[in-house]
């Protein structure tokens, strides 16, 4: 029953995120960088109807906003922004819970598009045991011509139970890790990027 309830929550969150059919990416200069992609992503409303943000997006948005202003992060938050690598990592640790947001982007093989990825994961007392309410691994394809990004099927079958995903800071492959109930690593595999999708 608990698994079913969590699945329903995840579906609801997925549907809400799917409402962001197309996101305009605003930037200065000749091309957007990772901060431009991330900021456009977190400032796009969860719902076209109510225009509100969920709790997780609000936390990430606040962290990015403070970074953009050159201000200190809230207590328990750390942020890593590597513009050269096209990678951002935000970590929040509160009361034994750790929220991790990873974002990255790179050029697709045809050079007409870029892939933007965002991964949100929750762990408790250092253990990755099941999905948090806002967990998700989402992909968007950015169109260099229209300067917008839309939801993209990158070929990844996402599973959130005892599974974690590590987005690349270098390279273009995703590391998938399965964890046992006691929080120990059981196995790892690599999702290989082929220029347009991931292969298992």
Protein language model features and the residues they cover:
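Short, surface-exposed coil-to-beta transition loops
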Residues: 97-101, 116, 126-128, 132-137, ...
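Short, solvent-exposed loop/turn segments at conserved positions within beta-propeller repeat blades
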Residues: 30-33, 81-84, 130-134, 182-186
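Mid-length scaffold segments of soluble, non-membrane domains
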Residues: 109-153
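Short beta-strand segments that buttress and anchor functional surface loops
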Residues: 89-92, 117-123, 175-181
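Structural signature of eukaryotic scaffold interfaces centered on beta-propeller domains
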Residues: 102-111, 164-170
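Terminal domain-start segments
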Residues: 20-106
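Short aromatic loop motif centered on NTY/YTY
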Residues: 148-200
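Bacterial Sec-dependent N-terminal signal peptides
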Residues: 1-22
